Amino acid sequence: MNQFKLTLLVALLSSLAIGQQKSSHQSVIEYVNPFIGTSNYGATNPGAIAPRGMLSISPFNVAFDASGREIPLEKDSQWLSTPYVHENEFLTGFTHVNLSGVGCPDLGVIISMPTTGEIKTNHLDYGSAYENEKAEPGYYSVDLKKYGIKTEVTATQRAGMSRFYFPAGTSNVLLNLGLGLTNEQGAMLKFVSPTEVEGLRMVGSFCYNSEEKAYPVYFVAKVSKEPQRRGIWKKHQFYEGLEAQWMGYNGETRMKENFSRAVVGDSIGGYFSYNFKQPTVVELKVGISYVSIENARENLEKEIGEKNFTQVKMMTQRAWEKQLSAVEIESDDENKKKIFYSGLYHASIHPNIFHDFNGDYVKSNGEIGHTEGERYTVFSLWDTYRNYHQLFSLLYPKQQMQMVNSMLSIYDESGWLPKWELNSTETFTMVGDPAAIVLADTYLRGLTQFDAEKAFTAMKKSAETLEDNPLRPGIKEYLEKGYLSVDRGVSGPVSTTQEYNIADFAIGQMAEALGYAEEAKKYKKQSLSYRNLFDKEFNLLRPKHANGNWYSPFDPDKGANFEKNVGYIEGNAWQYAFMVPHDMRGLIQLMGGEKKFVKQLNEIFNNQKFDMANEPDIAYPYLFNYVKGEEWRTQKKVDELLQKYYKNKPDGLPGNDDTGVMSAWMMYGMLGFYPVAPAQPIYTFTSPKFDKVTLNLDTDFHPNGKIEILSNASEGGKYIQQIWVDGKVYKSYFITDRVLKNARQIRFELGENPKK
């Protein structure tokens, strides 16, 4: 039985605990602001979700407004990957499957909407302005101004519940299966009783996925009161010429009351309509599954059943309280605590579970599988290998192990490790071979409860398969020349060479840990081939032709802000200049020594070449720690970036949260350490931002159970003067994962002046 099921069983017994806590120990969830990241393209949403939930209920406000004019942030007018944007003012319903902090649009479907008066089926007609939004972990509420309806929503991992406060008169619950964030189309809906519908909605358009990769989300929806009227609608395709003569409803929307057969189409929906003599509450319960309608119904019955709204909300908030209590912060800075816990909240959304209550799930090959444990999905690995999985290896090792085992199951089913997997569909978004890095990093941090030999075999397959290799395009040239050229059609050949190098280093680390000395030597040597692209004239990595000549003309600045360029993915030569975390000492030598290394780093920060909103350079503020006497620059720069980009406001993220990676960066900066080198179990220090933090570790993995991080941060100093580990002076700015986890206390003395 999984952790969340156990939480559901005990939650009712402790549901009053949150409200009864003494004021001296405020509930952790009260420090979460789900609106952080809903502006500035953070791509989060304030909807209700359980930890690692497969279902979430989010307000949907990214369609055109009621006048039909284009709103500033509308889903089809630009690249918008979220169902909700804080600046928008026109709400057209509540979605039941969503993604958080991703860079491509998908899901955002199964949209419910309460209305009054005549039934309208076009969202431009029935949408409403809104006010009085409130969001907490597991809960969201809003008032619809057009109708005078208050709506509250909550969710479990696989089911959701909405509560609509209708005024007297004609009221309606709409279920729109045509509208959605995804660009995929197609749906089915059927009434199985006056109060229950079942159906499916097609999704799967993530990052230009092909039509062949579309897949269904199944659902069951129930209302708490039997309606006076019910039915479906379908908007028909518009035909011209002879075909149009045979269709009296050509291009029109037809309403079918009391229609009990299945209806199929691209723009369909259902409605429940009431005539209330007095204000009345109607509840809508929805269960989902990626396996079948039957499983969606079972998920709904097992997780919600006859429970009322308050019970469901309290169960989920109790689960969030447990999840977020892995970190205890003692500080008078309420704002920073809210920023931190909101980040931990956002990082606990994806990867999310993909299996049903009974253990069924869709395998990567399309078959139905079964697990007695957990099956996770949404592996944004190009992002998360850099810092996310290290954080969860430390704070939530069981969850990290479940993710690793899910990745190995994907390998069993598809023959390849994941790259950017979504709902058992490999999207092949971004570049590199990031799964290998995550597997090695997890193992080297002491989480070894997975089939390491299988993992090593899978890692080598992607590194050695020369033909039809979906994970490493251009692998043959890479192995022959030691780099990818601009002539073979591989995206971002410089960036991709660097990514392959980091993955090769990880494979070498794994080989060494497993006792394969020769393979360790081979892969670690291979991981240094980025040096073939180092141009001493610029002290940067530069694109090359297959014949060994430099690509010209070379503009190191080209590629910033997603500008198209020849050599790099989502960046330019400056933003990739130091992305060789496994060979920082070697890079220092290549650049001509420590002084030139620091000069080049300062060039990035002093001349606005650093991009806090994307992954390739996010470790750069910590690289000053590799040069003795320059560590203060790391402390200064991390502090500046935290203050500039992380706020307790909707625009409180530097950009797309990338399934929690940007939030993880912030949390490390506030805690005072960062995993600067993936596949190396080390951290490097910076100045913490709280006087006391207790990390409550899982004693099944970390025997000490707790690590205290102490500092005098509240006195205003941001520069490290001294560090103590368990009472002894610690003279290095680097600490291994093992030493950190075995420590009971790490104490920082901070001051106003840098220690040079």
Residue ranges of model-derived segments:
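Bacterial Sec-dependent N-terminal signal peptides
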Residues: M1-S23
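ATP-dependent phospho-/nucleotidyl transfer catalytic cores
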Residues: A503
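Short aromatic-glycine motifs in intrinsically disordered, low-complexity regions
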Residues: K706-E715
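Accessory carbohydrate-recognition regions in carbohydrate-active enzymes
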Residues: Q21-I437, Y443-Q498, Q509-N532, F538-Q575, ...
